[in-house]
Amino acid sequence: MEEKIINKIMTGSHDLNKWLEGGYEKDIITLFYGPAASGKSNFIMLAACHEAKKDKKVIFIDTEGSFSIDRINQITGGIPEFVLKNIIILKPTNYQEQKEAFFKLLNELKSENIGLIVVDSITMLYRLELADARAKGIEEVRRVNFDLAKQMKALYETARKREIPVLITSQVYNEFLSEEDWLSGKQPGVEMVGGDLLRYWSKCIIELQNKNGKKKAIIRKHRSLPEKEFNFEIVNEGIRRRGLF
């Protein structure tokens, strides 16, 4: 049990720590994907606050404007200043700026006190860039995908070599149904933006769902844990297990 604690960071939630048997692994990328309002940003904000409160530096690449001082104030119980001074925020607004943010990230890694890297989300600006690239041809599409692969590789190597945990999020879209499937009443499944590219580099993948206001996390990929579910609710202090009712 001691080895697990050493090789993981706490999630910031007691219930979530129990579900993940100790927290997030240090030497990998952990990926959260799900629709809007499913809790993706809350999972990573909670972990960021927990590390920052330990006086560890957190690099937070915010492409969606999800970083909220008010939310940090709730999570920390009204003492955000100490936490905020330990969070390095980068806010790219287009795909080129996102690529530049990764160069800044690598420079910040010269510090010996980095406890966590967060990207929320890694696919929003990619998705916009990809839409433009498709109008220009296959070579542009390849370029955009190659750039994302380079970013994921940089995160993966950082996690592996420096044992700095990396948490990222991705958006989702409904899969395309054929006319035959649609007429048969088949419901479209949910696909992750970034697909196989993100799956390849991420060693822990957690799907988040929000159905009729009831939120659920599902482990879809993990090195040591089976696929399992965690019903949860978001509260001021963070995340806690939801009861049966």
Q: What is the predicted role of each segment?
A:
Residues 157-245:
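Phosphate-binding/switch region of NTP-binding enzymes
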Residues 7-8, 36-37, 95, 144, ...:
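Short, flexible loop segments at the rims of nucleotide/cofactor-binding pockets, characterized by
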Residues 104-197:
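P-loop NTPase motor core
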Residues 56-140:
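Conserved inter-motif catalytic segment of the P-loop NTP-binding fold
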Residues 1-86:
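The Walker A/P-loop phosphate-binding site
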Residues 10-13, 17, 26, 69, ...:
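Amphipathic alpha-helical transducer elements in NTP-driven molecular machines
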Residues 20-25, 37, 48-52, 76-77, ...:
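Signal for well-folded cores of large energy- and translation-related assemblies
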